[in-house]
UniProtKB/Swiss-Prot annotation:
Sample GO molecular function, one term: GTP binding
Similarity comment: Belongs to the TRAFAC class TrmE-Era-EngA-EngB-Septin-like GTPase superfamily. EngA (Der) GTPase family.
KH-like domain residues: 369-453
Biased composition annotated in UniProt, kind: Acidic residues: 171-187
Residues reported to bind GTP 2: 200-207, 247-251, 312-315
Record: residues binding GTP 1: 9-16, 56-60, 119-122
PANTHER family the UniProt entry points to: GTPASE DER
Location of the region described as Disordered in the Swiss-Prot/TrEMBL record: 167-189
Domain EngA-type G: 3-167, 194-368
A Pfam family the protein falls into: MMR_HSR1
Record gene name: der
Function, in words: GTPase that plays an essential role in the late steps of ribosome biogenesis.
Assembly, per entry: Associates with the 50S ribosomal subunit.
Protein name: GTPase Der
Length: 458
């Protein structure tokens, strides 16, 4: 039986370090300064034979509800409300603070099992703080070190004691029982969610858009630019489509990024792009389509991901011919993803979300598309009849055979003579022909030239 644990505590006590250790990956950003984590992040964790959901949360701070810190606290309280048990963490080196005491009262009132972790307790410096934690009235504190992995066996025992029903081993099934009544497995496997990463400049409205798709304020939003730091994934079902959507930090020009934490956030956003199948580039309609938007789109194309452009905050501008001009600019400046869908949306008002999800589903299908060999070679014959490759130094280039070895993105191999002599302009001509003939808008197309391995070689 699965269960969920929320890691809570004041800022900089080591919550994200523990989260990363339990999920076995460096998913959450970690830095020495307090307040790095803002949104709550979920992951699949393992500890011994236990499998469970773990939630990393923002550090608890006393703050006005309308402030950024107050909104972060509301996200943490929501995580406490959804969890089966709480891992309350303190910094044993520093000892108890008034903030620890205040939020221990909050956790105690939630009525859920609480496991008290005295983190950073390795060495003599942590002993006094561990003993001091008894005063919180949350039970016996566990000496722990998230950084070095000390105390994990004690944590395992504490989880089993706190959640005996959820952690009890499942009874083994008798393989011979009821064999005559076992139904065959269905051929159709459950459909996987489409992995979607939302990228854009700071304050483009990425988190607001995802919250609207979810139908709840799951991600931290506000007027401040640069609120999102970690890349947070959430599962969305909208208009019948299943999506796993990654929210990311806003991407500024590299030359403007000086802060170490912003560099980490940008790297995390680009890593999320590499996990994606479809990338939604969210453009702020109240600002012109800038060079940074083009850079992001070019990165997506070079990474081989399907692209959809969301024209956000479109309710705030008089659209008129804006979309037409944007389409012309994108096709001219980004020929490698010609025909990319451009969808006017409003994350705040909820306008256009059905069209955005439909565009994501369509782009995913195109990205996965395969073309049979016979149609490919009929295409090759037709384009070479209409426009044969130019002769180089008096010698004709022979285009012999084309095949598609892989999709995601559509990738083609052309067997020909003198691959080094084929002009780039002719390769672009072939790629554009493939895109138009086989209906491949908005995805990068890979075309590789080879001289050997042609099964129809002379």
């Amino acid at each position: 039986m699965t269960f969920s644990l929320a890691i809570v505590g004041r800022p900089n006590v080591g919550k994200s370090t523990l989260f990363n250790r339990l999920v076995g990956k460096k998913l959450a950003l970690v830095d020495d300064r307090p307040g790095v984590t803002r949104d709550r992040r979920e992951g699949d964790a393992r500890l011994g034979d236990l499998s469970f959901r773990i939630v990393d949360t923002a550090g608890l701070e006393e703050a006005d509800a309308a402030s950024l810190e107050g909104r972060m606290r509301a996200q943490t309280e929501a995580a406490i409300g959804h969890a089966d048990a709480i891992l309350f963490m303190i910094d044993a080196r520093i000892g108890l603070t008034p903030t620890d005491r205040a939020f221990a009262d909050l956790v105690r009132k939630c009525g859920k099992p609480v496991i008290l972790l005295a983190n950073k307790s390795e060495g003599r410096g942590g002993e006094a703080g561990t003993l001091e934690a008894f005063a919180l009235g949350l039970g016996t504190p566990l000496p722990f070190s998230a950084e070095h992995g000390e105390g994990l066996s004690d944590l395992y025992d504490a989880i089993c004691d706190a959640l005996p029903e959820q952690t009890r081993p499942e009874p083994e099934e008798d393989e011979d029982a009821d064999t005559d009544f076992v139904e065959e497995e269905a051929d159709d496997k459950p459909r996987r969610p489409i992995k979607v990463t939302v990228l854009g400049r700071p304050n483009a409205g990425k988190s607001t858009l995802i919250n609207r798709l979810l139908g709840e304020d799951r991600l931290l939003t506000g007027p401040e630019a640069g609120i999102t730091r970690d890349s947070i994934s959430v599962e969305v079902t909208y208009a019948g489509a299943k999506l796993e959507v990654f929210d990311t930090a806003g991407l500024r020009k590299r030359a403007r990024i000086e802060d170490k934490l912003e560099k980490l956030s940008a790297a995390d956003a680009l890593r999320a792009m590499k996990f994606a199948e479809v990338v939604v580039l969210l453009v702020d309609a109240t600002h012109p389509f800038e060079e940074q938007d083009l850079r992001i789109a070019d990165l997506v194309a070079r990474e081989g991901r399907a692209l959809v452009i969301g024209y956000n905050k479109s309710d705030l501008v008089a659209r008129g011919g804006l979309i037409t001009r944007l389409r012309e600019d994108v096709d001219r400046l980004l020929p490698q993803v010609k025909g990319v869908p451009i969808v006017p949306v409003s994350g705040l008002m909820g306008h256009g979300l059905d069209k955005l999800v439909a565009a994501i589903s369509s782009a995913h299908k195109v990205w996965n598309k395969r073309v049979a060999t016979n149609p490919l070679n009929r295409f090759l014959q037709q384009v070479t009849d209409n426009h044969p490759p130019p002769a180089v130094s008096g010698r004709r280039i022979k285009l012999r055979y084309m095949t598609q070895p892989k999709a995601r993105p559509p990738s083609f191999v052309l067997f020909c003579s003198r691959t080094d002599a084929v002009p780039e302009s002719y390769i672009r001509y072939l790629v554009n022909g493939l895109r138009e003939t086989f209906d491949l808008p908005g995805v990068p197309i890979r075309l590789t030239l080879r001289e050997k391995g042609n099964p129809y070689a002379d």
